[in-house]
Amino acid sequence: MTALTLSTAAAPGLRADAIVIGVAKGAGGPSVAPGAEAVDKAYDGRLAAVLETLGASGAEGEVTKLPAPSGFKAPVVVAVGLGAEPEKDAGFDPEALRRAAGAAARALAGAKKAAFALPLAEAADAGVVAEGLLLGAYSFDAYKASAKEAKEAKGAKAKANGNGKAPLAEAALLGGKPRDKAYKAAIERATAVAEELNRARDLVNTPPNDLDPEAFAAVAQAAAKEHGIKVQVLDEKALVKGGYGGILGVGAGSASGPRLVKLSYTSPKAKKSLAFVGKGITYDSGGISLKPAGHNETMKCDMAGAAAVFAAVVAAARLGLEVNVTGWLALAENMPSGSATRPGDVLRMYSGKTVEVLNTDAEGRLVLADALWAASQDEPDAIIDVATLTGAMMLALGSRTYGIMANDDAFRSAVHEAAEESGEPAWPMPLPEHLRKGMDSPTADIANMGERMGGGLVAGLFLREFVGEGITWAHLDIAGPAFNEGGPFGYTPKGGTGTAVRTLVRVAELAAAGELG
């Protein structure tokens, strides 16, 4: 991962491959953002005019490269768009800074060192810039020959990106205060969160032949040991003994057995406890209700919820948050075979309720149901589950926004605010009571399907049935933004995105501070 430093050095004398500056979109054309004064001065105050001549407007995500002025030790200036120029005395939007830093980091793949002269009015700005560039520098090429060649050429720690270039090796943030505790803390937080989010991306991007439930559980065990997190793994025998019918039913058709992983981070100063529950379908074929052909290769991402939960728990431990956080990873592979669960089968869940399976491709809610009930037994102050659950949510909110449902409006609002503060687009969704009747079953206590319209909300209502009485709960349906099938943008790569990690970490921080809901 890119090495970060805070520097008080002046841009002209800094040895680097490039100087990154910000450009805002003003009413009369592009304007040079604070932090780039030395660069602008070297252009005799005409940098904005030069950029406009080159076609730059300051639009968000725009990247323009130009030769550095005479006397600069860095040969190139990289101007990144920050979007609309803020009003007088107002700072730049944190997400605009985050995305600009990410876009610059992507543009600088292959560079050894870059200096970022972006607006750092306060420590929080340093944190979001650091987070953006660390996330933007991410790449996943472990399975490419070009990656192996680049690794051998640049050393064991190098990791190539798609064009054979290693990610930006080092970044110096100019204008920060290296000795200021607030700045140091902001950088440390950004580093921990970004590293764990990138770990979640790695898991989502890993081919399913290398990441089955057992392999995922092993990754969690190794990380738990490294960071002092207690871990418990229930294998098939333990799941049978415990009566986890939902997880077992989903995994019944696969040669790779299911797992339920419990990660427990505890703080001696904690006054609150949270449980995060993640859907971890390491590959989703749909089971007997087989998915149609087309884009099935992306179904490796159906464990993105579990990856987000795993990353968030580890990040909480690394940050030493004063809150107890338990992560539940419900891991299974949904495959068709002679032993697979059939439409019409009835499963007895861990809670004791029975579920009639009308569609085996509505499997995520089955593994989550068992994990939610297991999490409820610890009586946490709140539970949040994360899942790539329904295509209906994608139709409702698109590919970049996830939906939030909850059994408490105030808690739903608090989670939504945490998502916004983290830079993760989300939207509150209802749980209409009239939709519950559609899941009535003549055979079992409830069916795993209901009305076709409002399918994302129906799924939320199903999950609510398995949350312990009196426990505050929220459900994040991340089906849209969990996997980016388009081109990279800002700090978001193609493939796994790590959606919801930052929201969960922010929720944990708020709980630790006694400010959640």
UniProtKB/Swiss-Prot annotation:
Enzyme Commission numbers on file: 3.4.11.1, 3.4.11.10
Domain of life: Bacteria
One Pfam family here: Peptidase_M17
Residues binding Mn(2+) 2, per UniProt: K279, D284, D302, E363
InterPro entries for this protein: Leucine_aapep/pepB, Macro_dom-like, Peptidase_M17_C, Peptidase_M17_leu_NH2_pept, Peptidase_M17_N
Reaction(s) this enzyme catalyzes, per UniProt: Release of an N-terminal amino acid, Xaa-|-Yaa-, in which Xaa is preferably Leu, but may be other amino acids including Pro although not Arg or Lys, and Yaa may be Pro. Amino acid amides and methyl esters are also readily hydrolyzed, but rates on arylamides are exceedingly low; Release of an N-terminal amino acid, preferentially leucine, but not glutamic or aspartic acids
GO molecular function terms attached to this record: manganese ion binding; metalloaminopeptidase activity; peptidase activity
GO cellular component, one term: cytoplasm
Cofactors (names): Mn(2+)
Protein family (similarity comment): Belongs to the peptidase M17 family.
Compartments it resides in: Cytoplasm
Cofactor binding note: Binds 2 manganese ions per subunit.
Protein name: Probable cytosol aminopeptidase
Enzyme class per UniProt: hydrolase
Residues of the active site: K291, R365
Record keywords, A-Z: Aminopeptidase, Cytoplasm, Hydrolase, Manganese, Metal-binding, Protease
Residues annotated for Mn(2+) 1 binding in this entry: D284, D361, E363
